[in-house]
Amino acid sequence: MNCKAVTISLLLLLFLTRVYIQPTFSLISDCDETFNYWEPLNLLVRGFGKQTWEYSPEYSIRSWAFLLPFYCILYPVNKFTDLESHWNFFITRACLGFFSFIMEFKLHREIAGSLALQIANIWIIFQLFNPGWFHASVELLPSAVAMLLYVGATRHSLRYLSTGSTSNFTKSLAYNFLASILGWPFVLILSLPLCLHYLFNHRIISTIRTAFDCCLIFSLTAFAVIVTDSIFYGKLAPVSWNILFYNVINASEESGPNIFGVEPWYYYPLNLLLNFPLPVLVLAILGIFHLRLWPLWASLFTWIAVFTQQPHKEERFLYPIYGLITLSASIAFYKVLNLFNRKPILKKGIKLSVLLIVAGQAMSRIVALVNNYTAPIAVYEQFSSLNQGGVKAPVVNVCTGREWYHFPSSFLLPDNHRLKFVKSGFDGLLPGDFPESGSIFKKIRTLPKGMNNKNIYDTGKEWPITRCDYFIDIVAPINLTKDVFNPLHLMDNWNKLACAAFIDGENSKILGRAFYVPEPINRIMQIVLPKQWNQVYGVRYIDYCLFEKPTETTN
């Protein structure tokens, strides 16, 4: 682990994974990513996209400043190259992955300097075999970017806790200020324990000076972001405050996060078991006894405690602490291995066994995510290869119904294709469309019709199926009273163009949905423990398909 060649190999593998493998193969795990970030970014780059109520100037709880760095990358790509539109999607993901690599590389160097090179290398291994990080680090979400920025904050926190450097304390807070003001104000919670540490260990005068510097950084960052968002919305738009007001201060039974679903207290423990190998979680608990870093561990547990108390829970809410979990685990693993320094053979056996279990469980989870949940991206990508020589209309309508929430991004659609929603069993508020005429500011500032913050259905967002040119759906039974498209009984000359395998959640067992088991092992388990194994493992797939309604031709 101390060998320079090992370090270089791990970093090269990390770079390859973050910049190529993840952007290419990772899934989109949340429709909020699609409709609240990919679609507005598509509007900035290509002039059209779906619009959620959060982007209505009436509510303005999503930040355009958050999207501007990605627009600045994609604008020259589209201006000076002839790349097809779907490349915007993968280039953006690659940029996120590259940013993740840079943050991880710098933290690796800091861990090596402040703690030990072996701990740093173990941390990289735990980061590589981290199913949660695999998809989170290339997601276009404020919580995902906050996760990456907090790696930068952790780097400076380590330096501060090792040297007492005030400048590194300030830099750590600056990273978190940026993450909070750009779109997710709750990450400020993570800095509270570090602030307490500084307060307890410095004189009043020094604390006041540092507080002034931090307030200045916070104010300048907030001013820049608020001015940017206010220009886009055409009115004063303190987005971070609006998010806090909607989700906490003004939350009620009719509006607020809880109307989108609530989960029990054990949702997050189960989620962590899916996103981290079991040895990493066990080691992370042991790592908190490295008391020199107590402000970091206090941040970790404060975050879990605060979000466990909230009825509305989502996987992405835990993203910012992912790096702390692997850091704590790597410290603990290093200390455990040192207990066996006098028994080198046993030490090597323990090290190899733990790393193999970590890698095996992580790969099982990652392969399951790719195999089970990436069909929507694969199917929508087919539009880039379809022969559009005989385009049937200036605008081609790509429709979907019950599968609306699996739509990945309009970047996967050609320039003249638009996503439309037909009637289905969904009874909440669907996204509408940004206007396509006028300047970008006019499109953003126009008050959309039929928007509300109570998730109330709006019929104005329905599209008649008779005006659909393509349709995306799973080949599964429908609700005959609510769904208007039946993929099992195609009518009106609809043809099946392309399909990809998608997990059948209702008919798959819990382990089959969550983990991939190689077929030889699956067969062995069916022989050894047939009854018990079949109760917990089984995978069934359905087709996720693209259908076309051919144009009528005249002789």
Swiss-Prot record:
One of its GO terms (biological process) is protein glycosylation. GO terms for molecular function: alpha-1,2-mannosyltransferase activity; dol-P-Man:Man(6)GlcNAc(2)-PP-Dol alpha-1,2-mannosyltransferase activity; dol-P-Man:Man(8)GlcNAc(2)-PP-Dol alpha-1,2-mannosyltransferase activity; mannosyltransferase activity. The keyword NAD does not apply. It is an enzyme of class 2 (transferase). Residues 29-62, 108-113, 198-213, 290-316, 371-555 are lumenal. InterPro entries: GPI_mannosylTrfase. It is found in: Endoplasmic reticulum membrane. GO terms for cellular component: endoplasmic reticulum; endoplasmic reticulum membrane. The chain crosses the membrane at residues 8-28, 63-83, 87-107, 114-134, 177-197, 214-234, 269-289, 317-337, 350-370. Its EC number is 2.4.1.259, 2.4.1.261. Residues 1-7, 84-86, 135-176, 235-268, 338-349 are cytoplasmic. PANTHER family: ALPHA-1,2-MANNOSYLTRANSFERASE ALG9, GLYCOSYLTRANSFERASE. Belongs to the glycosyltransferase 22 family. This is Alpha-1,2-mannosyltransferase ALG9. The gene is ALG9.
